[in-house]
A protein has these predicted regions:
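Oxidoreductase cofactor-interface core, primarily capturing Rossmann-like NAD(P)-dependent enzymes
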Residues: 2-27, 31-32, 47-49, 57-60, ...
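Short loop/helix-cap segments at secondary-structure boundaries that form the rim of catalytic
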Residues: 31-39, 54
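Rossmann-fold cofactor-recognition segment
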Residues: 36-48
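Short glycine-centered helix-capping/turn motifs at secondary-structure transition points
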Residues: 148, 244-245
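Structural motif detector for alpha-helix initiation sites
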Residues: 164, 196, 214, 263-264
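Terminal hydrophobic/aromatic helix or amphipathic segment near a protein terminus
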Residues: 186, 200-244
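Short acidic/histidine-centered micro-motifs embedded in hydrophobic/aromatic stretches
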Residues: 191, 236-240, 270
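Amphipathic terminal alpha-helices
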Residues: 252, 257-270
Length: 270
């Protein structure tokens, strides 16, 4: 049996769609009563150990989508709880959606590396999908204003962005053949790096890219009503891209998909 956690999230929902025709898959979510799903659903709450121990019973392969929305200690506690429960329940293999290695400069990298280490120290089989940042995230971070300006502190930096749907496709392919990917770490970044100027050109001649400073971005984000932990996360993301740490491309995604990855610009503008 396959179980997918976080099935109501943006990535999890795409994965659930792709597994809908299988009779060996169940979906996990914190609020199953609010989830209309094409597959059986179990209550899986990373903050509630009992739901994990019960929900993971009978599971052979666990696709563990990162519960990364929170402070580092919160995320590590959630992931550690899930790994311990999976091991206790007799899960044979865990596929974990992590963060690209080039993201080590990002403020939210530490819980991912901690989780990878915990998985590797467990008695279960494991596969780590080091996902690149979504093209859709870049589009949100650098969205045009009503007057046609993209204002973001990206400088000349570029991001090897990935279409979220490609990461969903890759996760499904690995999960349904987990044994063939045991002990593997995949760097799932894009094959083309894009920046603010590329986004502006893709929007058309009426849109211009105007870099701002990190301080300006911090003030703007702080005034937007973002959660306190979100502001340094987003500013750190801008900083890493601008500094050129997120532009390295790779071919693991194409290898898993068996096709060319989708254009990050097309995904960003969709």
């Amino acid at each position: 049996m396959i179980l997918v956690t976080g099935a109501t999230g943006a990535l999890g929902a795409l994965i659930a769609e792709r597994l809908a025709d299988r009779d060996d898959t169940v979906l996990g979510t914190r609020e199953p009563q609010r989830f209309e799903a094409p597959l059986p659903v179990r209550r899986i709450d990373f903050d509630d150990l009992d739901t994990l121990i019960t929900g993971f019973q009978g599971v052979d392969v666990l696709l563990m989508i990162s519960a990364g929305y929170g402070e580092d200690d919160t995320v590590m506690a959630r992931h550690g709880r899930a790994i311990d429960a999976a091991q206790e329940a007799g899960v044979g293999h865990v596929v974990y959606t992590s963060l690209t290695a080039d993201g080590d400069h990002l403020p939210y990298a530490l819980p991912h590396r901690w989780t990878e280490r915990r998985l590797q120290q467990s008695t279960m089989g494991w596969t780590i999908l080091r996902n690149g940042l979504y093209a859709e995230l870049l589009a949100w971070l650098a969205a045009p204003s009503e007057d046609g300006r993209i204002t973001a502190p990206l400088g000349e930096g570029r991001l090897a962005a990935v279409a979220r749907v490609d990461l969903a496709d890759a996760a499904v392919r690995v999960t349904v053949e987990a044994a063939a990917h045991a002990g593997r770490i995949y760097e799932l970044v894009g094959e083309r790096a894009i920046g603010g100027a590329d986004l502006a050109r893709a929007h058309g001649p009426h849109v211009a890219y105007e870099p701002e400073t990190l301080a300006q971005a911090r003030s703007r984000l702080s005034a937007s009503g973002a959660e306190p932990f979100q502001v340094p996360m987003l500013v750190g993301t801008f900083s890493a891209i601008a500094a050129g740490f997120m532009c390295r491309t790779g071919g693991d995604l194409r290898q898993i998909l068996g096709r060319e990855p989708r254009s990050p610009l097309v995904a960003a503008l969709a």
